[in-house]
């Protein structure tokens, strides 16, 4: 979310990313450095949908900054601004890392992120009224850049045969461009596969084309085994752009994902 915050806020705000892009946001713990950064913050921008529930509430509570408490103008969740996929499932921990309110990994969908940018501009305008025009202009510019790139991304992925993901973390991008999800390496979210489960997945995909994608914090072992079994390309990709990225950096991040999905063609 740091890239989007920079795209909308520009030089009117200093943006600090609390979680490095190569870290699993499901597994982080609150750290003193987070609390220091939050103590003087005017606004927290989170993905939401309970993705950061294991660490962000604790970090905010211990920062002793009432401005950024949930429910205050200084707390903003991207997930609250858009329609989520995978919503409405039972809150049953035996089913793995489930999110009953919806899949939180919406930031790989550039169209939803353009919608979030508009909402973020309004929140920034509320906190910093003199900058309202600038925030809205920047959000519209980001949305326009997404619109300009959509036809090229769509052409690139037309006819893409599909992908196996380690986790359901790129489904927003797949849904946006109609790329089939052929399977997930995890049998349930957050649970690594057994050898038998991996063999069954490979057997069901024999004779098909596709690509295998996984994040830096996910074990490469199972993706590489599946890659050898199916003779498919396997590629490691971060779910987030670099920590210092801005709007163009986010768009380049989507370029990399589109290129990777097209590898299966």
Task: Describe each region flagged by the PLM.
Residues 1-265:
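Extracytoplasmic metal-acquisition and chelation regions
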């Amino acid at each position: 979310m740091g890239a989007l915050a920079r795209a909308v806020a520009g030089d009117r705000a200093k943006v600090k990313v609390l979680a490095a892009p190569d870290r699993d946001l499901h597994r982080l713990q609150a750290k003193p450095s987070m609390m220091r950064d939050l103590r003087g913050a005017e606004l927290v921008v989170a993905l939401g949908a309970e993705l950061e529930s294991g660490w962000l509430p604790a970090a905010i509570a211990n920062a002793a900054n009432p401005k950024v408490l949930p429910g205050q103008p200084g707390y903003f969740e991207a997930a609250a601004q858009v329609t989520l996929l995978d919503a409405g499932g039972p809150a049953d921990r035996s089913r793995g890392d489930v999110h009953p309110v919806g899949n939180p990994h919406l930031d790989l969908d550039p169209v939803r992120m353009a919608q979030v940018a508009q909402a973020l501009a309004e929140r920034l305008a509320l906190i910093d009224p003199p900058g309202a025009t600038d925030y809205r202009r920047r959000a519209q510019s980001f949305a326009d850049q997404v619109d300009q790139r959509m036809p090229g991304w769509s052409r690139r992925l037309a006819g893409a045969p599909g992908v196996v993901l380690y986790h359901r973390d790129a489904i927003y991008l797949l849904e946006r461009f109609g790329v089939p999800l052929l399977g997930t390496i995890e049998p349930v979210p957050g649970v690594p596969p057994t050898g038998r489960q991996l063999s069954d997945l490979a057997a069901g995909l024999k004779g098909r084309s596709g690509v295998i994608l996984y994040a830096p914090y996910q074990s490469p072992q199972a993706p590489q085994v599946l890659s050898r079994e199916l003779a498919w390309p396997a590629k490691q990709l971060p779910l987030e752009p670099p920590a210092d990225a801005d709007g163009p950096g986010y768009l380049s991040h989507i370029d990399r994902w589109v290129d990777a999905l097209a590898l299966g063609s």
